[in-house]
Amino acid sequence: MMGMMALPGSHDIVRHVLPNGIVILVRENPEVASVVVQGVLDAGTLYDGPGQEGLASFVATMLLRGTQTRDFQAIHESLEGSGAALGLSAGLHYTGFSGRSLAEDLPLLVELLADAVRRPAFPDEQIERLRGQFVTALKIQEQDTRYVAGRMF
């Protein structure tokens, strides 16, 4: 039987508060050579204004489509080159981010995430490409009987 100390819990989570108020929780597992980074930003679809429905989802998706220092290709080549993954998506109350990499590539993962959130570029060609993808997805949803019925009830 495993001892209670072997299970993750509050006893092995370290809490850091950055000067800007961001709270970081860390649980080390030295037996694993990879890291997982997850978090939320107070920017969900609930904050989409009238006539702007879908804006939070669109922006969350656009964040990894280009920054002031990296274009779409450079971001994804960096991720692929290190075997890392990074994603952002908007929920009702929050926009979440999640990433994973080898522990040695954590600085790159954090740098890419910070660049996406702090210095987004919203390149025109990516906006148009994503807009087309969103419109296609909406058209497909409207053909889905289960989706349409779920909206009615």
Residue positions per predicted region:
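N- or domain-start disorder-to-order transition segments that initiate the globular core
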Residues: 2-34
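A short linear-motif detector with a strong N-terminal bias
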Residues: 3-5, 15-20, 41, 64-66, ...
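Short glycine-rich loop/turn motifs
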Residues: 22, 36, 150-153
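Contiguous N-terminal and early-domain "leader" segments and peripheral loops that mark the onset or edge
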Residues: 24, 43, 139-140
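M16/MPP (pitrilysin/insulinase) zinc-metallopeptidase core fold and M16-derived inactive scaffolds
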Residues: 31, 36-103, 124
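Acidic/histidine-enriched segments that form metal/cofactor-coordinating
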Residues: 74-153
